[in-house]
């Protein structure tokens, strides 16, 4: 992702500035990475109940809701964004796997 840092940071800043259309650029840049991350965190048993795309969708939606509420005031660039999306996605995948194992 190092070659598109300006466009990602620009999209993030535009979105924080009120341009709701710029979230699409962020989605396109990160969704497949989030799916891969979730895939690595879910075992086969968990994936039969909720696949990695569900986790990635949930993580991105959670990020959007929380960012709109102003919960991430230090979110300034693509590195901040990736770290945050990584944490949200990892936690959701781990929680989903735990929940599915209990069921």
PLM region descriptions:
Residues 1-3:
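Intrinsically disordered or compositionally simple regulatory linkers and C-terminal tails
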Residues 11-14, 22:
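Amphipathic coiled-coil alpha-helices
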Residues 42-46:
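Hydrophobic alpha-helical bundle segments that form small-molecule/ligand-binding pockets
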Residues 40, 68-69, 87-103:
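Arg/Lys-rich amphipathic alpha helix in sigma70-family domain 2
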Residues 5-12, 27-31, 47-70, 79:
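Conserved RNAP core-binding helix
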């Amino acid at each position: 992702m190092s070659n598109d840092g300006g466009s990602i940071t620009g999209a993030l800043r535009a979105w924080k500035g009120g341009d709701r259309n710029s979230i699409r650029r962020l989605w396109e840049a990160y969704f497949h990475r989030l799916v891969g991350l979730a895939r690595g965190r879910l075992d086969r048993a968990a994936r039969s109940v909720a696949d990695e795309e569900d986790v990635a969708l949930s993580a991105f939606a959670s990020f959007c809701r929380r960012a709109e509420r102003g919960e991430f005031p230090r979110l300034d660039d693509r590195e901040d964004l990736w770290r945050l999306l990584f944490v949200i996605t990892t936690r959701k995948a781990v929680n989903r796997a735990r929940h599915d194992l209990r069921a």
